[in-house]
Design a protein with these regions (language model features):
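Extracellular/luminal regions of secreted and cell-surface proteins that mediate adhesion/ECM remodeling
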Residues: 262-426
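Short, well-ordered coil/turn segments that N-cap beta-strands
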Residues: 25-27, 61-65, 99-104, 142-146, ...
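Catalytic cores of secreted or luminal carbohydrate-active enzymes
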Residues: 226-279
Length: 426
């Protein structure tokens, strides 16, 4: 994750700048908006247009963004009154909703120094006001999107609950199920500069809660806790998905020197590897195609936003493509898990005969992103990714022949022809 605007690091967002970030194999850019000049009133039309334009550029670049809004860049610098914050969230709601598909996650922001929910000059650093602001933000986003809060303690105060999200309530759209964590003093000292009231309890909570909610943030400075063994352990235990690539550079230099930086980069968030697969290799139309795929997640975390899973048939003679969506939610492919995906899909009677190559596709479920390769998940295996389609090769072939099916398929899942529209290059 690369920051682009917060703390005046970059004055304006450009497509060329985003392309440079993307060339580093980073797919999420952090957009931080300092609203200091709007502490006493509505956001201007120009500010709203700027935010909307930034989202447009992120979309054009084929990336997603993490967003945060705030007023203060130091302790003692003013934030805004509650009424102003709620009014501005209401102003932002149409823009956030219209661009939710390219928002990876939102940080709660607004309150206090750096939008980190402490040192509020308007007395907003209390559970009641935090609740009003967080609930307004959750309402401003669709239920498919989540918000990161600065510490577990703040979440517990807002919801009057200290137990983590359970597997049964994960992704159910409730406010609690949509709240994750960001730690902007990761590995700084024994309690990450006050991130944890009780570090043991906080870590135990996040280790379970952030199996189903996002965890991210940044390091502060080099400390004994940044030692690679501990860093990798905590990144894995707490299920980190996003890490500010710009801060702190000294920590990254240490990790590079000690040989663990590449592992951190590879394992942030999910990282799916294909282990094996078995598939029918010759079928008549009207038959059922049987598949069995085994994958593992070697990343620190799982997916926290919705994602489709498809098997693709691509005819080798003319590249016609047919897709079938699988009845599975990959957000439950947890770190360390080995996952077996198996089932049967019908071969339509009108499917042309010929040889087909098999692919696994994990596209964004939102229609406007679904066919864009940049928004499909690339498996970690070498040589399986097709950057022009976003498909992952299963290294298997299926021969379709005309004639009666050996056994007629009676299920509902079938392959359907993909539209002729070519996927975007981004």
């Amino acid at each position: 994750m690369t920051p682009s605007k917060y703390k005046d690091e970059v004055d304006s967002l450009t497509l060329a700048g985003l392309d440079k970030i993307k060339a580093k194999d980073q797919s999420v850019v952090a957009l931080g908006y300092n609203l200091a000049k709007f502490r006493h009133g509505k956001l201007s039309k120009a500010e709203l247009e700027l935010i909307n334009h930034d989202f447009k550029l992120v979309r054009e670049a084929g990336m997603k963004c993490l967003i945060r809004f705030g007023y203060s860049e130091s302790i003692g610098e003013p934030d805004a009154p509650l009424s102003i914050i709620l009014e501005q969230i209401a102003q932002l709601k149409p823009i956030l909703r219209a661009n939710a598909d390219i928002i990876a996650v939102m940080q709660a922001g607004f309150i206090g120094a750096w939008g980190e929910w402490h040192s509020s000059t308007n007395g907003l650093d209390n559970a009641a006001d935090r609740r009003k602001i967080l609930f307004a933000e959750l309402n401003a986003l669709p239920k498919s999107r989540m918000i990161m809060v600065r510490t577990p303690y703040y979440v517990w105060g807002i919801f009057d609950r200290t137990t983590p999200i359970t597997r049964t309530e994960a992704f159910n759209g409730s406010n609690y199920s949509r709240v994750g964590q960001h730690n902007d003093c990761f590995l700084a000292n024994w309690n990450d500069y006050g991130t944890y009231v009780d570090t043991t309890v906080g870590h135990e909570y996040i280790a379970k809660d952030c199996l189903y909610a996002p965890m991210g943030g940044e390091t502060c400075h080099v400390s004994k806790y940044c030692e690679p063994g501990n860093a990798l352990y905590q990144l894995a235990r707490l299920h980190w998905s996003l890490l500010n690539s710009a801060w702190n550079p000294e920590v990254y230099k240490l990790w590079e020197k000690e040989g663990c930086l590449n592992q951190v980069k590879k394992r942030l968030g999910y990282r799916f590897e294909l282990l094996s697969g078995t598939y029918d290799d010759s079928l008549g139309v009207g038959s059922g195609f049987h598949y069995s795929i085994r994958l593992t997640n070697v990343g620190f975390a799982a997916l926290f936003n919705p994602r489709d899973v498809q098997i693709i048939l691509q005819r080798n003679s003319d590249s016609d493509r047919y897709a079938a969506s699988l009845p599975i939610d990959p957000r439950f492919w947890e770190p360390g898990d080995t996952v077996d995906v198996a089932g049967e899909i019908g071969i339509p009677l009108n499917l042309p005969a010929g040889e087909y190559s098999l692919y696994l596709n994990l596209p964004d479920p939102v229609p406007q992103l679904h066919s864009r390769p940049s928004y499909s998940i690339r498996l970690a295996n070498i040589g399986v990714w097709n950057s022009s389609t976003g498909f992952n090769s299963l290294d298997a072939r299926l021969q379709i022949v005309r004639g009666p099916a050996a056994a007629a398929y009676k299920g509902k899942a079938t392959f359907r022809r993909l539209t002729a529209e070519s996927p975007s290059s981004r």
